[in-house]
Amino acid sequence: MKTLYSLRRFYHVETLFNGTLALAGRDQETTGFAWWAGNARLINLSGKLLGAHVAHAGLIVFWAGAMNLFEVAHFVPEKPMYEQGLILLPHLATLGWGVGPGGEVIDTFPYFVSGVLHVISSAVLGFGGIYHALLGPETLEESFPFFGYVWKDRNKMTTILGIHLILLGVGAFLLVFKALYFGGVYDTWAPGGGDVRKITNLTLSPSVIFGYLLKSPFGGEGWIVSVDDLEDIIGGHVWLGSICIFGGIWHILTKPFAWARRALVWSGEAYLSYSLAALSVCGFIACCFVWFNNTAYPSEFYGPTGPEASQAQAFTFLVRDQRLGANVGSAQGPTGLGKYLMRSPTGEVIFGGETMRFWDLRAPWLEPLRGPNGLDLSRLKKDIQPWQERRSAEYMTHAPLGSLNSVGGVATEINAVNYVSPRSWLSTSHFVLGFFLFVGHLWHAGRARAAAAGFEKGIDRDFEPVLSMTPLN
């Protein structure tokens, strides 16, 4: 029988006892990893690892294309996107494809094209993945030195980092070009209830763009999540794209400084842990962004935010009761505070009742009714437009409630109502994935640091208590 322990790793690995299962000739004896450790077997086989990554990209792109076509096939133009459980079409609509004034879908053909392009691309990636996994060279260092690497080669690693940064910067500029030159993007703040427009007057002032980073993350400030006009969003992408591209060039041309060589662990598993940490941060930020921000994620497509649905309810009943003769400026609620309107601690007029906690909501249907000091009583009495009433009633009944098992809506709702907002889905999924990525970061960072410190082999098995105990049988 072959030895149970690989030459490389002395801690116990639960695996097949005959040790004969070898996947594509890369077995536990030669690599130190069993088949189920996946790409860990390919740590030193750059060609095969390339195949695994290209095939993985193919799976991702195939999902995007297939899911895109599935959503197009099921799409009903008469219903809002957020009522149909769509998570991809809202992103395409936000980019200005296929929609017109008010977020109304006027053409689904661009969505079909997007799906087909992704499916075709996935076939190319799938072929490349299979080729490099099965037919291509096991290692790239000999035949294609530019694409080869050694994990310990600090200079090569920062060059690869630089290439990645440049690609990210190009991605950021693709959005900029779409907004500036290729038809524009959807702006929920456009007059009259949202429209597609080209963004002409970019915000490039560093004090504005980087001011977002210096804001507090809490209510009324909201860090970068508080961005509420497209000029700032697209201008931010100009800054971000430029920083990524220049940072990429810098990392390609330079070698790591001595402090970085000392401070960081330079191994494949360490790079994996750094990447997982970065993706985790991205996931948590995306969670907050999709939950609170109705500019980057317009409510016409994703449904209202939580605060927006709550304020919409207060507004809807203010409109109703005002029509029935209530004086909304002075009516007292059950707690002695204003029933419809009240003052915040700093003096602004805000909606009363439970929705007071969402006083800092900004939404396109509500802002026209504000004055210099919060909600304007005379505008609330004279200027409310039918479109504002319709939209707030719609948002009130589509709050982003609902659980992960798709049991939708408010707990008191009748069973026939089964509405789950895409905001709930997207923010919850990104939070959960961000958390798992963070745990993966801790796991791989711990292993990488242990390996670098030289105690990867684990506990000394000679002194385990179990060895001195009577066998179970």
From Swiss-Prot:
Classification via Gene3D superfamilies: photosystem ii from thermosynechococcus elongatus (1.10.10.670)
SUPFAM superfamilies xrefs: Photosystem II antenna protein-like
TM stretches of this protein: 69-93, 134-155, 178-200, 255-275, 291-312, 447-471
Keyword vocabulary terms for this entry: Acetylation, Chlorophyll, Chloroplast, Chromophore, Manganese, Membrane, Metal-binding, Phosphoprotein, Photosynthesis, Photosystem II, Plastid, Thylakoid, Transmembrane, Transmembrane helix
InterPro entries linked to this entry: PS_antenna-like, PS_II_antenna-like_sf, PSII_PsbC, PSII_PsbC_sf
Residues reported to bind [CaMn4O5] cluster: 367
Compartments, record wording: Plastid, Chloroplast thylakoid membrane
Its membrane topology: Multi-pass membrane protein
Positions of modified residues (N-acetylthreonine): 15
GO CC annotation terms, alphabetical: chloroplast thylakoid membrane; photosystem II
Record has Manganese as a keyword: yes
Name the UniProt record assigns to this protein: Photosystem II CP43 reaction center protein
Species in which this protein is naturally found: Olimarabidopsis pumila (Dwarf rocket)
